[in-house]
Amino acid sequence: MAAEAWRRAVQKQFAAKSFVAFRDLHRNAFREMFERFGLSGDLDACIDEAFDEYLRVRAYPEVASVLQQLEKEVALAIVSNMDTMLLLEALHNNGLSFTFVITSEEEQRYKPAPSIFQRAIRYLGLPAENILHVGDSFEEDVVGASAVGMGSLLIQRSGRSKDPVPKGTKVVRNLGEVRDFVRRSWE
């Protein structure tokens, strides 16, 4: 129940008309959770702990090797709802890098806003239909990428999605399957 309430609180912030930085988004979501569940505490300490956790998260085992293989074959970019410095530090902590890093902070809009995906199209210099966006959220990633004409894959490592997934959505379980999908699409 609390996890779903947190997810809804964050989604509400993503959908807000005016942009707020990722840290402020968390502050607003924590404040809403505190009020909803009658909690008290230090909001800044909660936010600091949440951000420390983002930096402790380790990439799945296949990520680095698959990205290294793919970058020899295609241009890679990351489109993220994280603030730029937090994302860059998380990537660095995992030994990962991308040619193009596009963040909601830079665009002042969260996924699924078309503008953040359009920025990726401009950076990559490719027609939208030649770009494949891979993400773990149907609403933020698949809907957003599809709205600007990109292809999309939904990654569901557990086999279950945090969002309802309509029929016809292309789903993979890991980045190895993404690599295989990309290679098959060239045949």
Model-derived features with residue positions:
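N-terminal helical cap/lid subdomain that shapes the substrate entry/recognition surface
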Residues: 1-61
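Asp-based, Mg2+/Mn2+-dependent phosphohydrolase catalytic module
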Residues: 31, 41, 64, 68, ...
